[in-house]
From Swiss-Prot:
Role of this protein: Transfers the 4'-phosphopantetheine moiety from coenzyme A to a Ser of acyl-carrier-protein.
Main location: cytoplasm
The keyword Oxidoreductase is assigned to this record: no
Keywords: Cytoplasm, Fatty acid biosynthesis, Fatty acid metabolism, Lipid biosynthesis, Lipid metabolism, Magnesium, Metal-binding, Transferase
Protein's recorded name: Holo-[acyl-carrier-protein] synthase
Subcellular location: Cytoplasm
EC number: 2.7.8.7
Source organism (scientific name): Vibrio parahaemolyticus serotype O3:K6 (strain RIMD 2210633)
InterPro entries named in the record: 4-PPantetheinyl_Trfase_dom, 4-PPantetheinyl_Trfase_dom_sf, ACPS, Ppantetheine-prot_Trfase_dom
GO molecular function: holo-[acyl-carrier-protein] synthase activity; magnesium ion binding
Similarity section: Belongs to the P-Pant transferase superfamily. AcpS family.
Amino acid sequence: MAILGLGTDIAEIERIEKALGRSGEPFAQRILSEDEMAKFSQLKQQGRYLAKRFAAKEAASKALGTGIAQGVTFHDFTVSNDELGKPVLMLSGVAQKMAQTMGVNHVHLSISDERHYAVATVILES
């Protein structure tokens, strides 16, 4: 096994909350998958949830070496949690095709947040 890609991103929660306040649900829909939107709509701390997903997806796109560009969109990534609460990152669309071309067999995601910031790191492994 070898590391094929590494990406990290940090998001200021207040900045995401302000954008959400200005643009509302359309802003969230631009970032979140359908499954993530279903959970988002039930939460009280929507800005924090959105900031963590934003950081995770940015980190994943950086690990691919593209950023959110070259056909890779936020919707190419879905973040969920396993039965123990560990974050799980699923790739689809262009991101999935790029990962397959790179020889990615394992995707690792870590997300942390505190009062002001959410941070995520993604490792793509063969």
